[in-house]
Amino acid sequence: MNSENLKDCFDNLQDGTVLAFYKSGLIGSIIPFFTRENKGEEPPHHVGIVYDVKRNKRRIAFKISEQGFHGGQYRDVEINKFNDTYYTTDKYFLKQKKVEMSPIKMTSEQIKRGIEDAIAQIGVKYGFTRLVLGAEFIERFLPKNFRRNLFLRLNKKNKLRICSTHIAFNLNKAGFNIPLDDIYSPLELIKLIQCLK
């Protein structure tokens, strides 16, 4: 991740911004093969949502709510500025080719509800079913209706979260009407969010 990309985050991050992470190297190159994106679309491999943004002239600190194999996290990230150089010590950010932002305009009440949901998910892990549903190759090979029916059957309690569905659930708790009857790839989620703007 380069200094220019970090500068963009430094200047523009706000509460409710969804971050899309794009990995470089072998993993980044095989993701398009396994997912449903159209030819030429570059799919992110992970998404998270930003809350609790605090900034001054030399530093921006925020928390990112995300769900992964490690379970739910609501972790601290900092981006610092030294002269005209922007940097972070966050290991996950450093591994990325780039990070793109999709800001969502939120009221203070929506932000509060989103943060409450993010905190409630700390440490919550999903089991084997969630791993299978989250596997990217399933995104490509299961017909949408079959996938949706499977998801609804396994998710009767509306608790099933992987990185992209975690964002959908979080935004619903915050007061946005995003359908919870399907499992979304990170790119599908980003497209849904862009319709909220």
Annotate each predicted stretch with a short phrase.
Residues D15-T17:
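Loop/turn positions that initiate beta-strands
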Residues F21-M106:
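Glycine-rich catalytic cores of cysteine/serine-nucleophile enzymes that process amide/ester linkages
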Residues T129-K197:
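Activation targets extended, charge/polar-rich intrinsically disordered C-terminal tails
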Residues E41, T107-I111, K156, L160, ...:
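Solvent-exposed, acidic/flexible segments
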Residues M1-L13, K23-I30:
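Beta-lactamase-like hydrolase cores
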